[in-house]
């Protein structure tokens, strides 16, 4: 098998790529090969109407012995041998008591005739499906294959309505909401599961001795409304929410009270009872409401809003549950080009991704307060972030799929095949006949995933659910070199392997040194080491500056503990960059870097090399600067540090510098037509107080006079666009940011 298929998640492949927020020179498209994701599609279906081609070795379904499918090329037997050699079942067994084949047929018939209102993964092995009629289906997996299907009809005919809107499933209780009823159904289990292997064993509700209770809730009367439910991680708080109802009062209708106008309810669960604690009316129509994973009593909402100019926006709000009351404590307004139709947060909840009606994709970073914009090749009605926070998948109801990294660089994808043909999108409609739309796309993973990068859990299965079937998973072939992992470091290393340095730097720039310091250092070291091994060009020089600038000139000031932990190690890379500049006689940039570092030995290196090259004026300036540093150290009584002991000086050089004033930010009217997928980076700043900030130049007047004769400073190109956040975020302080002037970073 070819090397591309046995490498890690991203293999080398040719293709086009979206423009980067960093300036880039034209590349040789003939020899340049790019990363892509290699996948397999496993459909849990026995239907012979899917019409999967027998030559598609990347798509699998189950077959019936009694009804062999018609083959197009006569390769079905070879495909069967390939599947069985990989321990993929070709036909399902029907042994008692599971009777897997009959259970799957019953499930497919149920999906054709009933609406699935909820699908929840309890863990990596068990999925629960709840249908509007009250049927509860449990699926057990072994890898990408079905192992067991249990259909439970215990609730059928025992509920006040068969139009279930949403549901919450826990090990202790079930909560149901209804489309046309202002009531919540609370089903409490009086008996716990007696199983040594809770992950695998599937129990029916009848074995748990349940009791059913109903609770009245406020809300619109005599109206069919989608009432959604969410629960926190400790299972003691629940929110029930629905879209805003028009406030227009009818002449014969009574005036609604505040309680009846509310569309967000806070409920408490304690001692086997459910109680409505408080209610509130959101300012705008909510798109998504969920509890935070880190703070169990915080509620995150995304609401549709409009600006003063009637332009669409999205409000990212934080509500807190304080003394059984829910109240809004923070609002961040994100301008959009069109209305948002989908959203998703990453596991660490510091990034919000929005899909819009114009096929644009917006990513807002809470830490940097930066907004990224990309154009997708589909209508982003579904978004799902990988548990590692490295990639996100965007899907459409038409069955299209596209992958982006967390810096919004697109990643090509292809199914396992004989030929290497990666594409921007994966179109399921061209692979099999699906009679309904794609309605769910979810990574198979627990609710809370560790972000330390030390876990051994592998998350390589994406659950797919079409409205009337089939069900299935998309298996990502992650390979042995990454040990099945798909993290930020793994993607950056693969980008470096394919010489996609801009994409690697963009991911590094999106990472937070304060929370992911170890991963940031490994990634930055890999990028800088790769660039220092190559010939210095203006492009690579800018890449080195940007990579080191993620630590030395971050968008937000780093914590002191972070600086102290990594400054000594990173200063060695800064010194290597200095000598790399000298090696290629980049005296101007090397001198400015030496000024920032403030190390005597660096100026002496410039002095001796300038003498060898006949640059007498520069040699004299460097020698004088080294003498000044000697004099300053003697005057202050500080002993001169050795060449490798000045790691803190590069940081100290930036103390006192602050952000330049930002002008009025606006969304760019037109996207650049350079690639099929367009991309911008839009810097957002929330300014409390005066917007006029002054840049304090650290250089003294003597340096200005000396350097003006022979040094020429280069400035970076401005970023593609800027966008001021119309913010009401309360917790953000008015502070400056470390900024490097001589280093060539804006």
From Swiss-Prot:
Species: Homo sapiens (Human)
Quaternary structure, from the entry: Component of the CPLANE (ciliogenesis and planar polarity effectors) complex, composed of INTU, FUZ and WDPCP. Interacts with CPLANE1.
Main location: membrane
PANTHER family linked to this entry: HOMOLOC-13, WD REPEAT-CONTAINING AND PLANAR CELL POLARITY EFFECTOR PROTEIN FRITZ HOMOLOG
Name this polypeptide is given: WD repeat-containing and planar cell polarity effector protein fritz homolog
Top-rank taxon: Eukaryota
Keyword Repeat: yes
Record annotation: effect of changing residue 55 to K: In a patient with Meckel syndrome compound heterozygous for mutations in CC2D2A; no effect on the assembly of the CPLANE complex
Pfam families: Frtz
